[in-house]
Swiss-Prot record:
The chain crosses the membrane at residues 36-56, 63-83. Keywords: Membrane, Transmembrane, Transmembrane helix. It is found in: Membrane. Residues 1-20, 113-177 are annotated as: Disordered. GO terms for cellular component: membrane. Residues 128-161 have a biased composition (Low complexity). It is a multi-pass membrane protein. This is Transmembrane protein 275.
Amino acid sequence: MPQAKKSTETLAPAPPGRSRSLLRSLPSPALCCACGLCVLLAGLNVTLVGAFAAFLPGHNVPLVVGPALLVLALGFFAACCVCSRRGPVPRARSSATAGQGGGRPGTVALEMESSERTAQDTTAVQLSPAASAASSGRSSPGPGLFALDPPAPATAAPYLPRTEGTQLNFPRDPAAS
């Protein structure tokens, strides 16, 4: 297995106003976004309840609490933006993984496996009513309830798809004709 190329890039230093410990302690952007959505929905619900409960805003508590929840939701979304702009968290590699071909952290090697193509992969069945204009003249029912056209003769390459499709012949409804 070929070794992955080692990166010689170094992590950028922390911005002057922030330390690395502050960046590590921030919550994930997904958590901030999920909390923001929950608070946003709660704020909208409380605001709508207050808006339709009474028309006097002085004695209507939901009209005060609802917008406060909406401002809190905006704070969560702002935190989501701040958390999503943080750089990658540096991870210390242990000596055990470094010596065993662990590769760079964060990279994944994908390996796809495919099977042989068979006639089953490319077989198509055409379903059409027997009395339609698109059907062939061979639409008379066979010995069974549903009859298939006879199979094509075997060729030298049995796994090549046939050029003509298999046609199902359904019995005709006597009431329709």
